[in-house]
Design a protein with these regions (language model features):
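Extracytoplasmic thiol/disulfide redox context detector
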Residues: 2-114, 188-191, 226-229
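Cysteine-centric redox/oxidoreductase cores and disulfide-bonded domains
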Residues: 113-202, 206-229
Length: 229
């Protein structure tokens, strides 16, 4: 006697995609707990994590990407160039920057996560470009090309060097900056501040010193609008 097989109902693709996204974001945040040890693994004398009292949300050399004539507030973002969530947030941040950049100072700080093999190297490349006045150009290049180099397990430093060449940088100066302990310490300082301030994943935003927990772009925009008054 034959038996009739009951066909299972196909999974909802949208629901499955949402589940994958939340799992991915959860993994990104969880990975932040071990960032410091991995990033300083190859440094003979690791930089000690600063106590909270010494942490600074904004330093003199922090990258200010807007410079309002009259500042109403500061939005600080700790980011990782290999982080998919950071890339997804970038168009939102760009839109808010265009809307509020004349009143809010937008500030970027490095926070490469250890789960991303090339995020620290990407930060070095961006900082090296910044030393030649091309911070924003290299910043944009990293996110534009993330799908090309993100999640690779081999070093992408040669690719990043081609980006420097495309941007017209002095390659000798770029190479020296990437290899410089001063450049590496510049990034480690951002990481140490972030950890001391409670950053465990990316992107993490602080508005006027307050760490934000955001549920929607509308909420994000409203917080900036309130600060910009």
């Amino acid at each position: 006697m034959s038996q009739t097989k009951t066909k299972s109902k196909p999974a909802d693709p949208a629901k499955r995609a949402r589940t994958v996204i939340w799992i991915l974001l959860g993994a990104i945040v969880a990975a932040g707990a071990i960032w410091y040890a991995v990033f300083t693994l190859n440094k003979p004398e690791p930089v000690a994590v600063q106590p909270v009292a010494d942490a600074q949300l904004v330093r003199e050399d922090s990258h200010r990407v807007t410079t309002p004539a009259v500042e109403k507030g500061q939005l600080v973002e700790f980011l990782d160039f290999e982080c998919e969530a950071c890339k997804a947030a970038e168009p939102v941040v760009a839109e808010l920057k265009a809307e509020f950049g004349d009143r809010i100072t937008f500030i970027n700080r490095y926070f490469p996560l250890p789960s991303h093999r090339n995020s620290a190297q990407a930060a070095l490349a961006v900082e090296a470009a910044a030393q030649q006045g091309k911070y924003e150009q290299m910043y944009a290049k990293m996110f534009e090309t993330q799908s090309q180099w993100g999640e690779k397990q081999d070093s992408q430093a040669p690719l990043f060097r081609t980006f420097a060449q495309e941007l017209g940088l002095d390659l000798a100066a770029y190479d020296a900056a990437v290899a410089s302990e001063a450049t590496k310490d510049r990034i480690r300082k951002d990481i140490a501040d972030g950890k001391a301030l409670g950053v465990t994943g990316t992107p993490t935003f602080f508005l006027n010193g307050e760490k934000l927990t955001l549920n929607s772009m509308e909420e994000f925009r409203q917080k900036l609008a309130d600060a910009a008054q």
